Amino acid sequence: MVAPVPLHPDVVALAPLLGVWVGEGTGEYPTVPSFAYTEEITFGHVGKPFLSYVQRTRAADDGRPLHSETGYVRSPAPHCVEWILAHPTGITEILEGILERIVTGEGDTLRIDVESTAVGRSASAKEVSAVGRTIELAGDTLTYSVRMAAVGMPLQHHLSAVLHRA
């Protein structure tokens, strides 16, 4: 029997993200028709100074696979977060920003706000020049929005979703 691995001290502030999240979202962009999707996100850890991240979406209407991405989330310094992502479409993202805990009378909210510092792409990938992500976690509800600049369009809203701890 394998004992659970203790959480690395550098990711304690990110610990509320750990687990499986399921929910629904919507997407839009000037170059594609609006769409709805279901989603599952898993944040895990192996005792190192990062969390693992795996995301999968399916079309809400017929369940066909849509998008997936995988990567790592790190907090190299207090209130700082780095998110490194790879997409099977040939895109990679390095995002950096802030990690804050907002305390209210109704409980704590964990907020992550990151912007891309680098976007890489393979020769066959569509052009994506910038990405921003905002994640808020309050209790067992995780909400996010994604902004994207792609195919000559400026940075603008692309995705939003509400997920609940499974």
From Swiss-Prot:
InterPro entries: Calycin (IPR012674), Nb(III)_bact/plant (IPR022939), Nitrobindin (IPR045165), PeroxynitIsom (IPR054873), THAP4-like_heme-bd (IPR014878). It holds the Pfam family THAP4_heme-bd. It catalyses: peroxynitrite = nitrate. Pathway: Nitrogen metabolism. Keywords: Heme, Iron, Isomerase, Metal-binding. Binds 1 heme b group per subunit, that coordinates a highly solvent-exposed Fe(III) atom. Its cofactor is heme b. Its EC number is 5.99.-.-. GO terms for molecular function: heme binding; metal ion binding; peroxynitrite isomerase activity. Belongs to the nitrobindin family. Forms a 10-stranded antiparallel beta-barrel structure able to accommodate a hydrophobic ligand in its interior. In fact, this fold hosts the heme group, which is located in a wide surface cleft. Heme-binding protein able to scavenge peroxynitrite and to protect free L-tyrosine against peroxynitrite-mediated nitration, by acting as a peroxynitrite isomerase that converts peroxynitrite to nitrate. Therefore, this protein likely plays a role in peroxynitrite sensing and in the detoxification of reactive nitrogen and oxygen species (RNS and ROS, respectively). Is able to bind nitric oxide (NO) in vitro, but may act as a sensor of peroxynitrite levels in vivo. PANTHER family: PEROXYNITRITE ISOMERASE THAP4, THAP4 PROTEIN. Homodimer. HAMAP family: nitrobindin. This is Peroxynitrite isomerase 1. It comes from Mycolicibacterium gilvum (strain PYR-GCK).
